[in-house]
């Protein structure tokens, strides 16, 4: 089952010619899930040739303009692609009012159902087939949430040699066992899945974390992430500014990834516009000194997320 993350915009605060505002899209077996929708989100979706109508749900971190100004255009354009499925939008207080005011002020033509759910407490906000999305609180200048998409546990690896040694012939019965069901042989012997399969295996996990003051406990929320997309807005020399504005340095993002345990890759995002493309190397170097598997995300960069086993 394919799982892939696309960075639609990597910039923070204001758009630049080469950096749209923060937005990440997750594609899982054809379904699309959008995390934030800053200015320029539509452009990246179009350039990546992604399908508007495949966006099942949108998860908004907080109600600051650089994270939501791309949403009205997405809502309007979704009416032009024969969408007939509801669009679910999750986020903090005032999100529903923003969506409704945008619809009325812009006199939007919407031919599908929009279901907005304002998050009042952390926890699972979306359950899909074989996965869920969980919201966790961050520490910003207003109510803000991070999100983690985590797949369910998978069955263990099937061992054909064990199946054959227990008298289960190659064929459909193997599929029955791999599906988690017992098999009864002609002689009455019952073979159970645990007899021929290894221990359960983890699914994949994607975490999205922006905007927030650094605090150690947040590492627990992203533990085990195959891909962690986390803001790295400032260099360490600007830590006082990061604290004042309730943002993070790239070194703090790397500390979260390191302390979480089992994070496979960290992608920095939400860069301050003060940094040129050349300057961003400083953010990367400071992060890699703490967590080597760190990359600078760029607009329209994609990250395939593979199973470990």
Short names for language-model regions:
Residues 1-48, 84-86, 147-149, 156, ...:
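Conserved beta-strand hairpin/beta-sheet module of binuclear metal-dependent hydrolase folds
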Residues 6, 90, 115-120, 134-136, ...:
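General small-molecule cofactor/ligand-binding pocket signal
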Residues 15-17, 131-208, 212-221, 227-229:
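Active-site-proximal loop/helix segment associated with metal-binding centers of metalloenzymes
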Residues 35-38, 55-63, 91-92, 207-212, ...:
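Active-site neighborhood of phospho(di)ester-bond hydrolases with catalytic His/Asp-centered motifs
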Residues 39-90, 118-120:
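Active-site metal-binding motif and surrounding structural segment of the metallo-beta-lactamase
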Residues 70-77, 102, 276-285:
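Metal-dependent catalytic neighborhoods of phosphoester/phosphodiester hydrolases
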Residues 83-87, 92-118, 274-276:
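Active-site neighborhood of divalent metal-dependent phosphoester bond hydrolases
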Residues 122-123, 214-309:
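Binuclear metal-ion centers of metallo-dependent hydrolases, dominated by the metallo-beta-lactamase
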């Amino acid at each position: 089952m394919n799982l892939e993350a696309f960075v639609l915009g990597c910039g923070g605060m204001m758009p630049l010619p080469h950096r749209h505002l923060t937005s990440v899209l997750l594609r899982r077996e054809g379904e699309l899930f959008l995390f934030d929708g800053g200015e320029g989100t539509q452009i990246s979706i179009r350039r990546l040739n992604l399908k508007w109508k495949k966006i099942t749900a949108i998860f908004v971190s907080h109600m600051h303009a650089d994270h939501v100004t791309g949403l009205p255009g997405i809502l309007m354009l979704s009416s032009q692609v024969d969408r007939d499925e509801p669009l679910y939008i999750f986020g903090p207080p005032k999100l529903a009012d923003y969506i409704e005011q945008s619809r009325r002020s812009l006199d939007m033509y919407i031919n599908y159902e929009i279901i907005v759910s304002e998050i009042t407490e952390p926890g699972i906000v979306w359950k899909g087939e074989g996965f869920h999305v969980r919201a966790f609180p961050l520490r910003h200048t207003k109510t803000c949430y991070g999100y983690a998409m985590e797949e369910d546990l998978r069955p263990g690896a099937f061992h054909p040699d064990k199946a054959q040694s227990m008298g289960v012939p190659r064929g459909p019965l193997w599929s029955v066992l791999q599906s988690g069901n017992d098999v009864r042989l002609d002689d009455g012997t019952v073979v159970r899945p645990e007899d021929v399969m290894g221990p359960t295996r983890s699914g994949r996990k994607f975490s999205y974390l922006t905007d927030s003051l650094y605090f150690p406990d947040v590492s627990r929320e992203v533990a085990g992430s195959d891909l962690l997309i986390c803001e790295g807005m400032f260099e360490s020399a600007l830590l006082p500014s990061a604290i004042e504005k309730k943002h993070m340095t790239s070194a703090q993002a790397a500390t979260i990834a390191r302390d979480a345990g089992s994070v496979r890759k960290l992608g920095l995002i939400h860069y301050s516009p003060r940094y040129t493309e050349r300057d961003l190397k400083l953010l990367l170097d400071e992060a890699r000194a703490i967590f080597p598997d760190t990359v600078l995300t760029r607009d329209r960069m994609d990250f395939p997320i593979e199973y470990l086993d």
